[in-house]
Amino acid sequence: MTLYEELQARGLVAQITDNEIIDLINNGKATFYIGFDCTADSLTAGHFMALTLMKRLQMAGNKPIALIGGGTTMIGDPSGRTDMRKMLTKEDIAHNAACFKKQMEKFIDFSDDKALMLNNADWLLNLNYVELLRDVGACFSVNNMLRAKCYEQRMERGLSFLEFNYMIMQSYDFYYMFQHYGCNMQFGGDDQWSNMLGGTELIRRKLGKDAYAMTITLLTDSQGKKMGKTAGNAVWLDPNKTSPFEFYQYWRNVGDADVMKCIRMLTFLPLEQIDEMSTWKDQRLNEAKEILAYELTSMVHGKEEAERAQAAARALFGGAAMDTEHMPSTQLTEADLTDGSIGILTLMVKAGLAASNGEARRLVVQGGVLADGEKVAAPTVSFTAEQLKKGVVIKKGKKVYHKVTL
């Protein structure tokens, strides 16, 4: 099986600009890039598709370029957005880029020039605006840009001229790297298709040469929602933002309808093994979820942390003695207490178990909250400083555990 055939079998290929792509990646002749706008100081589970794709392609002899969007982050990509992104300072972007590289090195081998990490601020921030309009802007049709899917959602709410330039900036990235780094391919999410076509067309018009683009399938659940968030919050690759246990539990709790799709798209397990697992039903689906969670946690946090997270999860949900060492936790201070105690509703909000007192109240009234194994009888229940110093384990629903201490 060729690399391209494997990518298809794993459900990763969405669109390609040209069949020439197949020969390039199969023969290890692609120098390709994927862009990462550094809008936070950590990558998320939503970046998994891109990171694992880069690893697969590099293993086949292709050369990855991880492009940090130091310049484009200052504009903000409107793709898939209904509002304008927060503007970041140069210092914020530099810090975020450094954090990204550390995490990417777990997937990509940057040694001996096997891969590059570039920052488009190095060329975008030095551009002369008049020259850009004359040399690059002339290659773009405003009519075509307005028809692009990435701008559709923003037109009614208002699209700033700043964001309207994003397609030109991304296209210029490809054009610049084609000339200076031999980059002949771009990969990205399926929502980036219009921006990517802009780059291949700019290279064709300015240089008379061919460049290629392929979009990868967006990772969505059976309801069509993007995966990589829990309770509205991102699942981070940084262990200080999302602990290895929480990370493990996110993947352990994916829906029955989504587990095999995630295994196929995100792990490096052989396709033959995955095909066999696809026949699993009922309780064996839980085994598949454990495999998924272990494989991904191992990739991000290492085998030791994956084993510890798996052991802790089995102890929590398997009826064994409770292991709270790796459980998500919140440490309160005396300032969080009122007259030496804290109510269950306030505690749940501070621990991130509920978005508001109202939501916490509803969960308690419905009987979905336990404290140290006992059902919380009423929304008026409170915990003393003495109890909190020993640690209180809150259970929400069937699978969410959280330790609160003082």
Regions from the language model: what does each represent?
Residues 10, 89-90, 96-217, 221:
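Divalent-metal (Mg2+/Mn2+/Ca2+)-assisted nucleotide/phosphate chemistry catalytic cores
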Residues 50-57, 177, 195-203, 296, ...:
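Buried hydrophobic packing segments
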Residues 7, 44, 117:
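Divalent metal-coordination and catalytic microenvironments
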